[in-house]
Amino acid sequence: MTIVQETIKSSTTYKEVDQKRWFVRYLMLGAVGIILAIKLYLLLFIVDFTVGLYSFFTSFLLFNILFISYIKFKDPYIYAKSMYVSNGITYGISKPLVSIIVPVKNEEGNIRNCVQSCINSTYSNKEIIVVNDGSTDDTAAILDEMKKEEPSLNIIHLSESVGKKQAIEAASEIAKGEIFVSMDSDCDMACDAVEKAVKIFNSDRKIGAISGHGRVRGATTGNALLKMQDVYIDASCRILKGMETSFCSVTCCAGSLSFFRREAVMPYMHDWAHDKFLGMENFKFATDRRLTAFILGTKESSGLEDSSKSDDSASNIMHNIPVLAHCKNGLDTRTSSSGSDTKNTNNKLRYAWKIVYSQSIKVNVGVPETFPTLIRQQIRWRKSFIRSLFATGGIYWRRPFYAALLYYLQISLKFLRPLIVLKVLIFLPLSGDLITILLYFSGVLFAGMIYGVDFRLRNPGSSLWLYRPLFTFMTTFVYSWLIIYAAITIKKTAWR
């Protein structure tokens, strides 16, 4: 019997929540289903048709996302673990070289904690590459100090800023690993994160990328904004990405912590780093979604056919990057991805990649602590969302039908939301339709409470779930307008 055929009893009996909480989940699904039926009746006979139709489809989407993420989602790490352990016996596991890449600019307050989490990783066969993207604060000095403490660190200082994407591209040319890890410089990973990701990759040759589970650092003791963002990020990972993982089609491998199989990402690295959009060279936004879209769009019949061409283009990147200094094992000793690595790639099967999320892979995320910085972040994210319409939206129909249906429905509702909110806040009061207004506000509160209760079920004892309804109201009545501003100012490249 092979390792793949082995099954561990503890993995098959793994439960995210106990039976009592599962019963509450079923009640939640039932409640959403009842609300969906009520909204259909209200749509046909009582409320404003436009608002009622929009509200009906939001509940339809909510029910499907919850149902699939509850019933169908299985953490890929639980399956991967079962491949290497059976009846208390641990089997051998391949330990490929992993390249951890951290691009950083002006993060003197976070970079030490971030890099230290990489050093503390329990996975031994790793290399750590930090690219200082022209920082003007003390980031460079901190990195040099850490280099003295940990000689194995590979640090590149760029004389001027080239942006996150090109910084990662430069690091990828140095990286020798079979697996790339990308982590934002204001985040810190759990010590076992890499170990778990490697097991997932080893469990399924067709997995091309993995996204981790983020939680806001310091949320329990932070201000209300941190608490609201924490419950939101938690749900966007476990519920939304959990649903997408059920179809092996996660739409965004977050910059906070993601893992990529080298052969899945390298063919697109150069095109991603030099993304063009609306006539703009090196489009600054949509870093995470755009890279994910490249991998999602790989055709099964020709998945890696262009890898040689893409790697050849990427191999010239360091000639265009303003390198100020680098440390031992840096640029001069790198192994070009256009060499033997490409030959090995061409001998492998060509297929479409699976992209999954693992709840077991943890990362602490740094988020804005003030409202103005939060709004600026959300504007950037909406510019990324607009770009993703042409990237992910253009290829997602190739993925499983129902996943594509829910994806296109979700983005349609997101674009329509400002118009619905405008009608609810302005036009319906003028026409005296108070019933529709009241029911719409009730629907927003209901959705927020559903997500809040879900958070509480998975985090018993935590009071943060109370902040989810507040965040839902903010996303509905504040964030909705940002998509319009983001579209108008999409050519404005200012990051802050």
Residues covered by each model-derived region:
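Non-transmembrane catalytic domains and loops of membrane-associated enzymes and transporters
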Residues: 2, 85-397
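Short hydrophobic alpha-helical module
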Residues: 381-395, 399, 408, 415-418, ...
